[in-house]
Regions:
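N-terminal secretory signal peptides that target proteins for export/translocation
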Residues: 1-7
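Short S/T/G/P-rich N-terminal loop/turn motif that feeds into the first structured element of a domain
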Residues: 25-248
Length: 248
């Protein structure tokens, strides 16, 4: 996937002939979709043109099917923004856990663009596309979100020159994190310094119950120029190489 144009193997396995055929097939499928975890993520957002919500979702689902048929090995997540003052019902699509090399080598770019022009572009406005770096020293998790049905999504824009102090302050609080909490720093694609925090959770109740405990430390308040907190709904029918967690 690309912005304005959605673009949305593992280790060798030696298998003895004594293994059942179905087991061999399972191993082969896992090897095809497994990726080494790197620090980079691509996060983008689009919204439906007025009156095109149904058409956009149908076209986007068709486009994701193109990725499957092309045997794309990227893991593609899709979320709908649920609680937001500005972006309700917008679609966030993202892929996580990449090395620089893997993110630079998407599947069949020309064919991807062609299918996107046919199925998605007539119904969508693209409103953001960035490459982010996962910050393990600020986080709890490995940078590839658990595909839970809900997530809290926080975007933070800082005053110029405040990035280092912000990261030092958050690193000092890392041990207090409750549950999966993933911080990413924007590398390219918008105003910097800016950050995204993603907190995957099974339910809205889990997000709300932890809200007070997950507030940013007071010492960073003067560093922030803008902060937005939204909640997302995972779209199980808009995933590639991602299996959503069962509802609880």
């Amino acid at each position: 996937m690309k912005h304005g144009w959605i673009r949305i193997v593992g280790p060798a396995v030696l298998v003895s002939t004594v293994f059942p055929a179905f087991f061999i097939a399972q191993i082969a499928q896992t090897a095809q979709t497994e990726q080494a975890i790197g620090p980079y993520a691509r996060i983008a957002i689009m919204r439906a043109l007025d009156g095109h919500t149904v058409e956009l979702e149908a076209g986007y689902i068709r486009h994701l099917e193109w990725h499957r048929e092309a045997k794309d090995t990227f893991r593609w997540y899709s979320y709908t923004v649920w609680a937001s003052t500005e972006r309700q019902r917008w679609i966030i699509y993202a892929t996580f856990g990449h090395t620089a090399a893997s993110l630079s080598n998407p599947i069949s770019p020309a064919e991807d663009e062609r299918d996107n022009l046919l199925n998605v572009l007539p119904h969508a406005q693209f409103l953001g596309n960035g490459v982010y770096e996962f910050l393990s020293g600020l986080s709890r998790g490995n940078g590839v979100p658990t595909p839970t049905l809900r997530a809290e999504y926080t975007t933070v824009e800082l005053n110029q020159g405040a990035g280092k102090a912000f990261e030092v302050a958050l690193a000092a609080e890392q041990s207090k994190l409750q549950g999966e909490t993933l911080w990413y720093r924007m590398v390219v694609g918008g105003n910097t310094p800016s950050y995204v925090r993603l907190r995957p959770r099974a339910t809205l109740a889990a997000i709300l119950d932890e809200h007070a405990d997950q507030a940013l430390p007071d010492k960073v308040s003067g560093l922030i120029s803008k902060m937005t907190v939204e909640t997302l709904n995972l779209r199980p029918n808009m995933l590639v190489n991602v299996t959503p967690e069962a509802a609880r």
